[in-house]
Amino acid sequence: MDKVLNREESMELMDLLGLERAAWGNLPLMRKAYLKKCKEFHPDKGGDEDKMKRMNTLYKKMEQDVKVAHQPDFGTWNSSEVPTYGTEEWESWWSSFNEKWDEDLFCHEDMFASDEEATADSQHSTPPKKKRKVEDPKDFPSDLHQFLSQAVFSNRTLACFAVYTTKEKAQILYKKLMEKYSVTFISRHMCAGHNIIFFLTPHRHRVSAINNFCQKLCTFSFLICKGVNKEYLLYSALTRDPYHIIEESIQGGLKEHDFNPEEPEETKQVSWKLITEYAVETKCEDVFLLLGMYLEFQYNVEECKKCQKKDQPYHFKYHEKHFANAIIFAESKNQKSICQQAVDTVLAKKRVDTLHMTREEMLTERFNHILDKMDLIFGAHGNAVLEQYMAGVAWLHCLLPKMDSVIFDFLHCVVFNVPKRRYWLFKGPIDSGKTTLAAGLLDLCGGKALNVNLPMERLTFELGVAIDQYMVVFEDVKGTGAESKDLPSGHGINNLDSLRDYLDGSVKVNLEKKHLNKRTQIFPPGLVTMNEYPVPKTLQARFVRQIDFRPKIYLRKSLQNSEFLLEKRILQSGMTLLLLLIWFRPVADFSKDIQSRIVEWKERLDSEISMYTFSRMKYNICMGKCILDITREEDSETEDSGHGSSTESQSQCSSQVSDTSAPDSENPHSQELHLCKGFQCFKRPKTPPPK
């Protein structure tokens, strides 16, 4: 390069290129600077034209001289100019052709004498072995495999890598990786004549990205790049024999606690089990109902209005227990999934009970559930009035003769579930009380009401509601050919006639719900309510008993004057029917498992509701008055009447009836104080004299 340009020209060119003098001879760098200065000095770009011309002149001269200097000068000759071999002209041409060759190419071919002497001995000696070429490693040392990722084709991103290469390339890669990825930590370790680079990056990368970057710098040298699964364990192994540290970016290296972050405060998780227990205890089968009820528990117990009123036992009884869990539940993102699992648990438990428990045990469990509810709402923390429910008992007792026997017989029917003797029919005109009694029986036993008036193609999923139910009610079944033209026609009776296998209960039938598999089971027993439609004989044979209802004006008037019965749905409540059974039936009629609780409730009714009070309730019903419009007057003869047991109460009722059976001259039916409205007549109690 010193012969290309003289010193002044070379210095001038480097100044024009804007490079340091030490860069003279770095042709790629000079070429890059030349192109850059061309844009700067070009006249069209607003540059200096003189500098542009001078720089072009010097740079072109340098390029030309460098090209000539690198070409070997062998002389130029043409084959036609070579004279004939052997002539004097050829000898002179050959001499002139060889003048330019370097004399160093001359070789002395004389042999040393010592070589000749040693020839004989050397012929019988073994020639020296050639050095074997050392093969490059194919993988990391085997003792490090447990710390490395062995994935070959993976898009997984990591933040720790290990590179295995030659010692020379490792020195270059150590700096290049540090600059390229701004590594958090990097170290170089000796390994059997080669190097291993261990480094941590602040961001996650694919192994292929690290490998591609390193391959650009390792054209001939071997390179193995892998991700690290156990960072500190690998680093610790590289610091012990047979490895040792050459250099690292942090003095002292890494410590174990660098990879063990401080444990954050343990985040509280929602207790799915606690929510499931609440759903099972309350027998909640509605996902959204359970979701709404549980979200109400997140508010402070002391400020909760429902807990202060104590009118909802499923709330105030569980609020304090579930308060802490409800706060976490309110912030959860999978509330519906939690509630769905809880509801599924309730349905699963019901199915197990249906399979393993007898129907009598299931009814006893249902009675226990109702008694628990009665203990709550009629207890110290409840706000229900026992007299109002006993008013409902009196009203229902006036609905049918011997109502307690009717209910008892129906329970006997659904408990034993005898094939072809499982269904009752409630038939009567509008507002005769059949639906009221059916709703109460449904709530007493537990079950579902079904609409059988749908078209046959839609009836499949309606019947699927009866899966795992104790009983069903086919409500307000419509038919054709009614005597009254006011009654609408429908497909209900025809559909029921097509469901004889369902009503008989002799064989199992397939029931299905949407999004659920078919369930094969005996269809549950129950009852049917309808208006005065004609019933085919084939369907009539499926009913073990038919009760004809008739509307009673005094019941309607009494109900209108006692609005609390409708507002609180007392007449449709299973608690009312259970109180009716407790009031009229003997303890022996109940299951032995609940007889002790029945005795407690009989004693409570004796202490709070006297026979006089109950008789006044029935009298007000017959008069069409408000049932609780009772004048409280104390009299030893009437107030002492109480009924310590059901047998006693029955004897008192019979004595009361015997009073009414006196001759007509004493108590004629035409008198104002005597009532006979389609049930057992009784005499109005005499008004006791004042104290």
UniProtKB/Swiss-Prot annotation:
DNA-binding region per UniProt: 141-256
Assigned GO CC terms: host cell nucleus
Keyword tRNA-binding recorded: no
Alphabetical list of SUPFAM superfamilies matching this protein: Chaperone J-domain (SSF46565), Origin of replication-binding domain, RBD-like (SSF55464), P-loop containing nucleoside triphosphate hydrolases (SSF52540)
Modified positions (N6-acetyllysine) in chain numbering: K683
Top-rank EC class of the record's enzyme: isomerase
Zn-finger region bounds: T-ag D1-type: 267-359
The record's free-text note on cofactor binding: DNA helicase activity requires Mg(2+).
Subunit (UniProt): Forms homohexamers in the presence of ATP. Interacts with host HDAC1. Interacts (via LXCXE domain) with host RB1; the interaction induces the aberrant dissociation of RB1-E2F1 complex thereby disrupting RB1's activity. Interacts (via LXCXE domain) with host pRB-related proteins RBL1 and RBL2. Interacts (via C-terminus) with host TOP1 and POLA1 allowing DNA replication. Interacts with host TP53, inhibiting TP53 binding to DNA. Interacts with host preinitiation complex components TBP, TFIIA and TFIID to regulate transcription initiation.
Full protein name: Large T antigen
